[in-house]
């Protein structure tokens, strides 16, 4: 019985230590989430402005017939997917949701292997390579608050692959942050830029201004920046969802640890009570034997 009590006590102490670790990790993820949410809000100001300007230029009569390759839809022979995952685990179902979605798309639409994968995140890279799937480019070790400089190269490589007709359309697959408890898998088309002409230009656009050298040249410079901003925005969004998933996972782990501790404590008290009862019984029996 003494051995059983010591084993239960050891389990309680071990679980309490685990609970402290997961609680600390939850607090760290929570702090990262707050920073990421603020970064996403700040970036949205820039993203909405560049979208407004780009839309307005595209709707003007001088550029509506632009032959910029980023605007031209062509027969789709191959599709590119930028897949954003985390670099580590402990984020609940964050990675499994997006990877399952990507694999379902590949199974349904790309049985002939007519796709290219650009992976951001070690989990995704390892997942695809373990299945013998080619990863054209990858980025590992993404910072908790990624700067544009850190992701500039892989974004530029993705855009160049489309422009050079290595693939004919480009999508970003990631977890969209809804709130601290919820994220949604999002598969968003980035290229060709097919939705802008249909958008309504903002009330205060640029069509009323004289632009130099000309609208075509400005648009040619602006479109890559616009596409890069869309992809970078998706990366920030995905990072925010990752931190939220990490916070939720660690909160769940902490709650589960507390439940285990409660169950073990009850088990310990019952075992201790049984041991005391047995000792009393033995003492009484011994006393009776001496009479």
From Swiss-Prot:
Compartments (UniProt record): Cell membrane
Keywords per UniProt: ATP synthesis, Cell membrane, CF(1), Hydrogen ion transport, Ion transport, Membrane, Transport
Broad class of the protein's primary localization: membrane
UniProt keyword annotation of Chaperone present: no
InterPro entries per record: ATP_synth_F1_ATPase_gsu, ATP_synth_F1_gsu, ATP_synth_F1_gsu_CS
Membrane topology, from the record: Peripheral membrane protein
Entry's Gene Ontology molecular function annotations: ATP binding; proton-transporting ATP synthase activity, rotational mechanism
Source taxon at top rank: Bacteria
GO annotation, biological process: proton motive force-driven plasma membrane ATP synthesis
SUPFAM superfamilies referenced in this protein's UniProt entry, alphabetically: ATP synthase (F1-ATPase), gamma subunit (SSF52943)
One GO location term (cellular component): proton-transporting ATP synthase complex
HAMAP family membership: ATP_synth_gamma_bact
Homology family: Belongs to the ATPase gamma chain family.
Cited function: Produces ATP from ADP in the presence of a proton gradient across the membrane. The gamma chain is believed to be important in regulating ATPase activity and the flow of protons through the CF(0) complex.
NCBIfam families, per database record: ATPsyn_F1gamma, PRK05621.2-1
Subunit: F-type ATPases have 2 components, CF(1) - the catalytic core - and CF(0) - the membrane proton channel. CF(1) has five subunits: alpha(3), beta(3), gamma(1), delta(1), epsilon(1). CF(0) has three main subunits: a, b and c.
Protein name, as recorded: ATP synthase gamma chain
């Amino acid at each position: 019985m003494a051995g059983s009590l010591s084993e239960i006590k050891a389990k309680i102490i071990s679980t309490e230590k685990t609970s402290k670790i997961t609680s600390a990790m939850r607090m760290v993820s929570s702090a990262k989430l707050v920073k990421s949410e603020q970064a996403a809000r700040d970036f949205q100001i820039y993203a909405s402005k560049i979208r407004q300007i780009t839309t307005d230029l595209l709707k003007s009569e001088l550029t509506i017939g632009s032959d910029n390759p980023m605007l031209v839809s062509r027969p789709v022979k191959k599709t590119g997917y930028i897949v954003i995952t985390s670099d580590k685990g402990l984020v609940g179902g964050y990675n499994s949701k997006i990877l399952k979605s990507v694999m379902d798309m590949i199974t349904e639409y790309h049985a002939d292997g007519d796709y290219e994968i650009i992976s951001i995140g070690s989990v995704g890279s390892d997942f695809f390579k373990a299945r013998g799937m080619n990863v054209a480019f990858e980025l590992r070790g993404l910072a908790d608050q990624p700067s544009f400089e850190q992701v500039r190269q892989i974004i530029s490589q993705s855009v160049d692959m489309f422009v050079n007709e290595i693939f004919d359309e480009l999508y970003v697959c990631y977890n969209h942050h809804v709130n601290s408890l919820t994220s949604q898998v999002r598969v968003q088309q980035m290229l060709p830029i097919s939705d802008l002409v249909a958008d309504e230009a903002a009330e205060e656009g640029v069509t009323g201004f004289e632009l130099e050298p000309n609208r075509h040249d400005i648009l040619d410079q602006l479109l890559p920046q616009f596409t890069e901003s869309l992809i970078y925005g998706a990366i920030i969004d995905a990072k925010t969802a990752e931190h939220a998933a990490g916070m939720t996972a660690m909160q769940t782990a902490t709650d589960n640890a507390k439940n285990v501790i409660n169950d073990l404590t009850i088990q310990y008290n019952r075992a201790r009570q049984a041991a005391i009862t047995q000792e009393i019984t033995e003492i009484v029996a011994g006393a009776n034997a001496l009479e």
